[in-house]
Amino acid sequence: MEIVKVGQYRARFASSQKDIFSAQALRYTCFNLSNKFELDADDFDAVCQHVLIENLETEKLICCYRILRFDNGKNISTSYASKFYDLKALESYTEPMIEIGRFCIDSEVNDPRVVLTAWAALAQIVDQNQTELLFGCSSFDGIEREKYLDSFALLRDQYIAPDHLRPKIKAAQVFNYSKDLIYKVDKKKALLNMPSLLKTYLSMGAWVSDHAVVDLNMKTLHVFTGMEISKIPKSRKNLVLNLV
């Protein structure tokens, strides 16, 4: 089922197991994983919807992500993020929510319209479901924190989640940067090393957990990220909506 088309790029929902295998293969490559199946797959693939962005000229899958919908926060403990974060603060959330995960783009693709197509599709989904909160895990490549100290310092200073929504520590290995990091931020360096997807979320008013999880399986550090739709700056929202 087609969601949206931007130029030569089309976003659609996966409609077969073959589609899901294609997404898992792209994720495997993008995330630099290593296993005999050459797929990035887990149990959540069976319960999520998969959004595929294809180049209609080459008929090639170039970007994908998956979503999991919630009517409210009551069942947020069944989300992927809840494996790593204590999300009890969000259980009383009354509005519809969507978890977004496994976002990746083919490394050979440099056209910014691909990301715009992905966001236009997500905007369509959010609007149709009257979603108020998008959430997920935003990853930093690798598990060595030193490269990202300025980025974490910037998150600490400007983007920590409000108290009533803030996830608590659950994972065994974390970097509690809000407490343990005594570091004066170099903003230029912080933005340079900040993951591009997280930068996009932050520009739309997103907030993050006060700690990062060390994910040895994916070989990443990640922070819980929440974005309240009603708080997205109008200029940013219009940029995406104009594509739909």
Residue ranges, per PLM feature:
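Short intrinsically disordered coil segments
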Residues: S82, N238-V244
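Short amphipathic alpha-helix that is part of the acyltransferase structural core
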Residues: M1-C63
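Acyl-donor binding region in acyl/amide transferases
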Residues: G73-A206, A212-V213, M218-T220
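Generic recognition of flexible, low-complexity loop/linker segments
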Residues: D40, H211-A212
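Conserved donor-binding loop and adjoining core beta-sheet/short helix segment
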Residues: G7, E38-D42, L52-S92, P96-I105, ...
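Long, contiguous binding/interaction regions
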Residues: P233, K237
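C-terminal "cap" of GNAT-fold acetyltransferases
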Residues: K219-K231
